[in-house]
Amino acid sequence: MNFSESERLQQLSNEYILGGVNSPSRSYKAVGGGAPVVMKEGHGAYLYDVDGNKFIDYLQAYGPIITGHAHPHITKAIQEQAAKGVLFGTPTELEIEFSKKLRDAIPSLEKIRFVNSGTEAVMTTIRVARAYTKRNKIIKFAGSYHGHSDLVLVAAGSGPSQLGSPDSAGVPESVAREVITVPFNDINAYKEAIEFWGDEIAAVLVEPIVGNFGMVMPQPGFLEEVNEISHSNGTLVIYDEVITAFRFHYGAAQDLLGVIPDLTAFGKIVGGGLPIGGYGGRQDIMEQVAPLGPAYQAGTMAGNPLSMKAGIALLEVLEQDGVYEKLDSLGQQLEEGLLKLIEKHNITATINRIYGSLTLYFTDEKVTHYDQVEHSDGEAFGKFFKLMLNQGINLAPSKFEAWFLTTEHTEEDIKQTLKAADYAFSQMK
């Protein structure tokens, strides 16, 4: 494929935009470098770049675009609302309608508030939990990404009894001292942290199904024990469902797994492609938030009518019969095809799949923990990524990320993807 115009625009972008990208994950640093492809438009399962190349897209904006690009129903809703106004700074009926649809789908959201991103949603749930418990420390699990606010950019200490250290320049040590990081799926480490820190722990922050070191399910009983241990300690359980809400079924992962948190943060998919975030949970906890309580959260753009309208339209698409069954079927076809090719070419790789989402890891281990992904073969992934890209398959440029199917992918797309993977693997021996 020819990428000359992307390369020219990336050079121009470097003159005006820091690093040439507005989010570091868009660079190709993790896959050996080079100019990232500059996209021009998207329709359904496909993206088209500035050089005229067409791609089958499995990045899907890192997850939000579950109905494909420029879905007609959602696009029409956005256009209609834009003609009526995009921001009023007042309540609208759309906020009520969208909140009701969300609570009908996720019953634990007894009360809801909207913000503008997943980062804001998680940041605010932590504040609310601290206000409710009158404690300061939180526990999170290694490898899970909860946005770019200071409190969650903290690396693990040497064990559950050790405090974290800043995972980014600009995060104060004083903030890092409020965070304990333990391995996901390691209930003994979680018990040790709770026993050591006791009544200092306000909340534990959990991705019920991990989406940020690939797709990783909780081990049987893990989430149930986290709930039990937390509540016996007076610690709240916060689920970060920014990736998982409406990803696997019409609702949240918590309902699929049958384990209910005290608070939930959500975002990505529910905005229909527009910026959105939100949080909700038990009414008595949510009543800590202003104007009813002392925990302050506000936002000029929060609950804006354009995002509300897009979210309503998105849910109208997802609540139709057969949507998630199709995603699961296509995901199964993709997984089975890749596994056959891995065996055919004697590639060291494994796959985690959850319905219409999967991750290909260049390792010989079944992945259940972050450390396994960290030690997987990044060089092999980088080579695979570029071999696929040059055949018109767009993946996330990181070994830690997932492939996302949409309602608009087809069996023919899967066949073309497997044909490309067959060639890519043949070049990796």
UniProtKB/Swiss-Prot annotation:
> Which EC number(s) does UniProt give?
5.4.3.8
Q: What is its main location?
A: cytoplasm
| GO cellular component entries | cytoplasm
Alphabetical UniProt keywords: Cytoplasm, Isomerase, Porphyrin biosynthesis, Pyridoxal phosphate
Modification N6-(pyridoxal phosphate)lysine occurs at: 268
* InterPro entries per record: 4pyrrol_synth_GluAld_NH2Trfase, Aminotrans_3, Aminotrans_3_PPA_site, PyrdxlP-dep_Trfase, PyrdxlP-dep_Trfase_major, PyrdxlP-dep_Trfase_small
Q: Which reaction does it catalyse?
A: (S)-4-amino-5-oxopentanoate = 5-aminolevulinate
Which Gene Ontology molecular-function terms are recorded? glutamate-1-semialdehyde 2,1-aminomutase activity; pyridoxal phosphate binding; transaminase activity
Tell me its family.
Answer: Belongs to the class-III pyridoxal-phosphate-dependent aminotransferase family. HemL subfamily.
Question: What does the subunit section of this Swiss-Prot or TrEMBL entry state?
Answer: Homodimer.
Which HAMAP family does this UniProt record tie to the protein?
HemL_aminotrans_3
The protein's name: Glutamate-1-semialdehyde 2,1-aminomutase 2
Which organism does this record belong to?
Staphylococcus aureus (strain MRSA252)
Per the record, the gene is hemL2
